[in-house]
Amino acid sequence: MGSYETELNLRATELRLGLPGSDEPQEKRPCSGSVVRSSNKRSSPELEESRCKSNINSDSSDSTTTSDHNEDSVQPAKVQVVGWPPIRSFRKNSLQQKKVEQGDGTGMYLKVSMAGAPYLRKIDLKVYKSYPELLKALQNLFKCTFGEYSEREGYNGSEYAPTYEDKDGDWMLVGDVPWNMFVSSCKRLRIIKGSEAKGLGCL
């Protein structure tokens, strides 16, 4: 029997995995990534399974960390688009109007015009605390004089008379309402001639 196997040379024609020219068959590795230790003792199946799991977990964690790092390095920074989200025009206008009304408490500037003057001036109404202070400032600003104001006659007899436009769009004489009410309702000022002031207030 031995001579028959030798004659046929079955060992030479045997199929096996391995590099060409190597006579020893390659040992079957228990799992990828595990280190084969030369030992006469055979390890238990539970120990081999735990080693395989630990190697797989370490490989997967390394690959996950690498992929996360690559994603962080490649991902561009998010830039907020200007004008997004869109706001309706009426809502935008109301928001801007609220900001203007709230303001920063610095001042309340009003336009002042004078009959015959080709220019306008601006004054801060919050600077003044009473009518006399305001009238004095207007006289110095436009180099004019006002007569004394009375509830019955207004500025009767003076060359010029200061008037203001209220919230309703009506033109009234400066001094016909209490100061606080005037400050809250005044939109702009205009100095007119005394003759043109008839029909306003008491004139």
From Swiss-Prot:
Main location per UniProt?
nucleus
Q: Where in the cell is it found?
A: Nucleus
Annotated ranges, domain PB1: 107-199
Name the encoding gene, please: AUX22E
Q: Where is the composition biased (Basic and acidic residues)?
A: 43-52
**Under what name is this protein listed?**
Auxin-induced protein 22E
Q: Where is this motif: EAR-like (transcriptional repression)?
A: 15-19
Q: What is known of its domains?
A: The N-terminal half of the protein contains two conserved domains I and II. Domain I includes a slightly degenerated ERF-associated amphiphilic repression (EAR) motif which seems to be involved in the activity of transcriptional repression. Domain II is required for the correct degradation of the protein through the SCF-mediated ubiquitin-proteasome pathway. Interactions between Aux/IAA proteins and auxin response factors (ARFs) occur through their C-terminal dimerization domains III and IV.
- Any one Gene Ontology biological process term? regulation of DNA-templated transcription
What organism does this protein naturally occur in?
Vigna radiata var. radiata (Mung bean)
Expression is induced as follows: By auxin.
Its keywords, alphabetically, are: Auxin signaling pathway, Nucleus, Repressor, Transcription, Transcription regulation
Q: Provide the family line.
A: Belongs to the Aux/IAA family.
* InterPro entries per the UniProt record, alphabetical: AUX/IAA_dom, AUX_IAA, PB1-like
